[in-house]
Regions:
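Gly/Ala-rich phosphate-binding loop of Rossmann-like dinucleotide-binding domains
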Residues: 92
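Nucleic-acid modification enzymes, centered on SAM-dependent nucleic-acid methyltransferases
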Residues: 16-71, 99-228
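Glycine-rich SAM-binding Motif I of class I
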Residues: 85-89
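Conserved class I S-adenosyl-L-methionine
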Residues: 73-83
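N-terminal auxiliary segments of SAM/dcSAM-dependent transferases
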Residues: 1-25
Length: 228
């Protein structure tokens, strides 16, 4: 378990909000961004590991979880609609046990990978193996995806399928899920979908097609640059 150093306790702020509510006698508006001050790293740790629509801002779970008005060390946090795991990660960082559930399989994958610590050395070692094996594969079975040729160019489909076939062969479940989530990231970026809408751009998008045709997924180079 990993603990934050000098994590604030928002008990006093909560008691002040309760008094405001009692005095007003009806609902009150709360701006969590103004309460959780000096919170510059809202996307710290693995919060930005994968995009997800309508993500909960980090300030809200940070306020409630680091708050002795509601919780104490060692308490259990349950998020029955965990989405991409924002609450789960903040719970773990605050030394709380966390459980989550979601009907969306992608959400469950994001949450699981986001909250599982993996040694960066192991990640880089496996990435090197994946790329080396992928470059030796001429072709792989393309997954059955409805309207796949509308979402991807043939080149992108072929390279993504090769990567998926190699990742599927990983024996360590934790590592496999980590790289499968990263494959999802790459797949979204290389698709012909609009960047801000979950629909396919059925009108030919020359810029997107040029990106797919020019980008060589398997040519990624591994550097020793330290990532924060």
């Amino acid at each position: 378990e990993r603990k934050h150093i000098n994590v604030p306790d928002f008990r006093d702020e909560t008691e002040a909000l309760v008094e405001r509510y009692k005095a007003k006698g009806t609902h009150i508006s709360v701006n969590f961004r103004s309460i959780v001050k000096n919170f510059s790293h809202v996307d710290r740790y693995t919060h930005s590991i994968h995009p997800y629509p309508a993500k909960l801002i980090t300030h809200i779970p940070y306020f409630f979880i680091n708050n002795s008005y509601f919780l104490k060390d060692g308490d259990v946090v349950l998020d029955p609609f965990c989405g991409s795991g924002t609450v789960l990660l903040e719970s773990i960082l605050a030394n709380k046990r966390a459980y989550g559930a979601d009907a969306n399989p992608l959400a469950r994958l994001i949450s699981e990978v986001k909250t599982e610590y993996i040694d960066p050395v192991i990640i880089r070692k496996n990435l090197k193996k994946i790329l080396e094996k992928s470059r030796k594969v001429d072709n792989a079975k393309i997954p059955e995806i409805r309207n796949s040729t509308l979402w991807y160019t043939k080149k992108a489909l072929a390279e993504l399928s090769i990567l998926k076939s190699v990742i599927d062969g990983l024996t360590d479940d934790t590592i496999r899920k980590f790289f499968m989530l990263n494959l999802s990231n790459i797949s979204r970026k290389l698709s012909l979908a609009e960047n801000h809408f979950n629909v396919c751009h059925f009108v030919v998008n020359d810029r997107k097609i040029l990106l797919q045709e020019s980008y060589n997924i398997l040519s990624i180079k591994i550097t020793n640059k330290k990532q924060c």
